[in-house]
């Protein structure tokens, strides 16, 4: 990545050093793989005075493990390619691994990090809706120490997160499912499958003894951030998954969002695609 003129580059060797540098300069930006930041710099959307390169950091910021309670722990500096190819991810959350295969190119996935992907907060991203449907949490380090918050609370708006000055994402935690679940992510693109999604819908659901035991739907790329649709869970859980109920759930998933028209499609087009896609995805994961 080219360093902008007038910008300083620092390479801390530990997390505390990185946090201190970020906290001391409001114009500082962390750099993991640098993929998202490069796009912002190239298009003039960012002009940081200080870049904090996280490349020397080790420990829990890298790698994938499964904790004793079954939670999947993914370090923020883990590349998207590592998430895609991890046997642990494939076993724990196969929908997450599958979604990564449709994200940009292998070359990009070899460089881009999970923490950078989420911290970038571009509404046209694949993984936020998937991780929302999976109930993911993010671990954050900052001047006040460590904290954990739901991914839903991290995402605020267009290229905006709830991170305070000096904070950075250190890991993503995906809880284990209480019952065997199925997941599905469907993206609609204007060109190829590797393109930015015009609409992305993620579904996670389970049926136990003929009734819906788990049901989470999240939608991305249609507003300024990805959204979990809790009304769908309220509608489905405890019910027998009939075609009529699934259609109603899909309509519920598509309602109540402030759709934004852009180069990927009109607001009305996106709402229709969400409804149709959600119905198909729910039918698949709720099928016997």
How would you name each of these model-derived features?
Residues 1-288:
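C-terminal structural segment of proteins
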């Amino acid at each position: 990545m080219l360093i902008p003129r007038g910008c300083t580059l620092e390479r801390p060797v530990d997390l505390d050093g990185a946090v201190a540098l970020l906290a001391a300069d409001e114009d500082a930006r962390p750099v993991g793989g640098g993929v998202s930041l490069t796009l912002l710099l190239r298009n003039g959307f960012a002009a940081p005075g200080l870049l904090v390169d996280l490349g020397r950091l080790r420990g829990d910021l890298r790698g994938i493990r499964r904790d004793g309670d079954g939670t999947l722990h993914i370090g923020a500096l883990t590349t998207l390619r590592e998430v895609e190819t991890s046997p642990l991810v494939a076993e724990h959350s196969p929908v997450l691994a599958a979604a990564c295969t449709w994200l940009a190119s292998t070359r990009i996935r070899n460089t881009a990090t999970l923490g950078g992907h989420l911290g970038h907060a571009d509404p046209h991203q694949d993984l936020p809706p998937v991780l929302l449907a999976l109930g993911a949490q993010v671990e954050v380090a900052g001047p006040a120490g460590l904290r954990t918050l739901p991914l839903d609370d991290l995402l605020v708006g267009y290229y905006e997160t709830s991170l305070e000055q000096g904070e950075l994402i250190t890991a993503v935690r995906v809880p284990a499912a209480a019952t065997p679940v199925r997941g599905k992510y469907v993206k609609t693109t204007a060109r190829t499958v590797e393109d930015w999604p015009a609409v992305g819908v993620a579904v996670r659901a389970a049926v136990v003894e003929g009734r819906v035991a788990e049901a989470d739907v999240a939608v991305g790329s249609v507003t300024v951030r990805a959204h979990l649709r809790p009304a769908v869970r309220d509608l489905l859980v405890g019910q027998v998954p009939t075609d009529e109920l699934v259609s109603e759930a899909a309509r519920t998933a598509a309602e109540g969002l402030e759709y934004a028209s852009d180069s990927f499609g009109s607001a009305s087009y996106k709402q229709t695609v969400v409804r149709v896609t959600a119905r198909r995805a729910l039918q698949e994961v709720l099928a016997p």
